[in-house]
Each structure stands twice: as C-alpha cells, then as structure tokens.
C-alpha cells in the first residue's frame, strides 16, 4: 500500500461529517459519535464535543482509540500482569504502520502503544515519528521507563501526544518522574491501587506532585488474587482520599480514575458520568500476536491481519466486544459476583473431592470385609 500524506488521508475521511463549525474549530479532526461530533487536536489533546440538531444523524462507525501491544517482550516480570507471557511478538514496523495508517483512514484518532514494554521493540522511536509524520493519528505510549533514555525523548520530541509511566516498586520511578519533568516531556503516571499501597497513597501523590508530575491515573486491580482487590471499606477510604487530594492539589495536579473502577467511585466528582467503560466500542486492544480484544483483561481474542479485518469485527461482532470480561475486576459485572461464583466452584470441587474420598473409603471397607470373610472358618463373616 503506497504511503499517503496527512492531507490525502484527511480528504478521504467519511463524507457524512459535513457539519458547519466555527472558524476556530474548523482545523480539528472530526470523529462521529452517536448523535454527536467529537473534534480533536492531536498536538494539544484538545477535545470539543458538538451536539445538537446538526449532529443528530451521526453514528459512530470506528473506535476512537486502539491500545496496541507492539511487542510481548518486557524487561520486568510483574506477577499481576494481565498479558499472556507465552504470546508471540509478530509485528514488524511496516506491518504496524500500515495497519494503523489504514485504521486512521477509517476514522481512528489515537493509538496508545504498550505491550510488553514498547521501548524493547527495535525501531520504536522510528515508528512513533513515522506515524506522526505520515498519518493523522495521535501517538501515545505506556512504559515502565527502564529502557527509556533522554536520547529517546529527544528523538520523538513533538511527535507524541502523551507518555504514561507505570509506577512499580522496582523501576526507580522517582528518578524517572524527575527526569521526565526536567526534560519537559508530556507525561502522566499510572498507579495501581492495592490494599497495601492505599496506606501510603496520600504521601505518594504529594511526592509525585513535588517531583513535577501533573497527571496521576489511579488504576484498580483486575485479576484472581483477592488480596489485591480493595474491600468496600478500603474503596470508601480511597474515595475520601481522592476527594481530599483533588481539592488540595487543584490547579497543580490532575487525579484521574481508570475506567475499571466503574460505579465503585460514585461519590467522587467526575467530569463525565459514563455508565460503561467503552471497551470494544470506544477502544480496542490489538495484541502482539495479531488479535483484537475489547480490553487487555478480556477473554475474547479474535485474529486479524488487516485494518479491514479489524473493522469487520468491530462492526459485526458487537455483542462479543461489549460483553463483560470474566476476570474479576471488570466494571461491567460486579466483581463480587465473580468471587461468589469462584467460591461456589471451589466449594463444589471440595464436595466432589470429599465424595471421591468417601467412595474410596467405602470400597476399602468392603474389600476388607471380603478379605475377613475368606479368612474366617465356617464361612462366617
């Protein structure tokens, strides 16, 4: 496929979006929602929502963003990671570029690279720059920071929307945050809130702010380790901490919540009150072994090769893409239901084991009686 310029790609965007706009918004990229029009500037991150009679006929026909696992390779071994560590890393730079350029033509606004660790993918900086220069996409990525250097930041300067730094106990995040702030990188941090981390959350948030971080995203745990999930009491305490910190740091630092919190954080003030996380509709995950998922925690994984494959699944398999993940923590299904089901399954397995033991015991007793009967004289049992 010959590479097309931004102007050529933009000129081929869907024709059903000829909504008249104020002059100051006319240059923004257009994205159709159901009954509304979203305007987007990839360089500033500006989003403008237009809604009225002029947009009532519009329908969303593409995901707004894809989360792209460019590689399954990682330089950390986190026990709670949701990715399948046995999955292949099948993408090349050219294949990834072609797929994303075509998805941009279908209307996609953003790509967020992850993995694995994207900076272990050979030529990642080249891919970021090429996507910015030759498509209309906003390019973002999530990293643990261990392989990211100041030279890498210089190579992609002005070419990415935002980088997100994941904070772990073993990735020297304090020095990394300080470096990103010093280099004036456009960044935020991702922080997984567990019962243990909740105890020091206020201190961590204040420290991040002091180091120069202006964007903190608090994530909930998705997985089968019940000790990593917050209790109702801990969730309530977290809500209080968020409200306190948001008020104290207003104008200095934004505190955000991951979509997987769902309705657990109802008491926390929100910019938008969305009832759904958007997985499978607002965004898709593209895996390192060329499959698409509604989200990285989801059991549905459908093989694709081209952008046409992606769009065909997106438009024709809505019920699968918008279903709840089976993994505990999904906001589409109360994770308490998962634990109740898991508990029932565990109890059923224990009952089956007890029944098997009882059957073995009965058989052993019967065998014993036969042996005794044979040994006794006179045929008496």
Go through each PLM region and give its residues.
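Recognition helices and adjacent regulatory flanks at domain boundaries
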Residues: 18-63, 76, 132-133
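Canonical Radical SAM [4Fe-4S] cluster-binding loop centered on the CxxxCxxC motif
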Residues: 58-94, 295-297
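A C-terminal junction/extension of Radical SAM enzymes
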Residues: 218-295, 368-371, 377-381
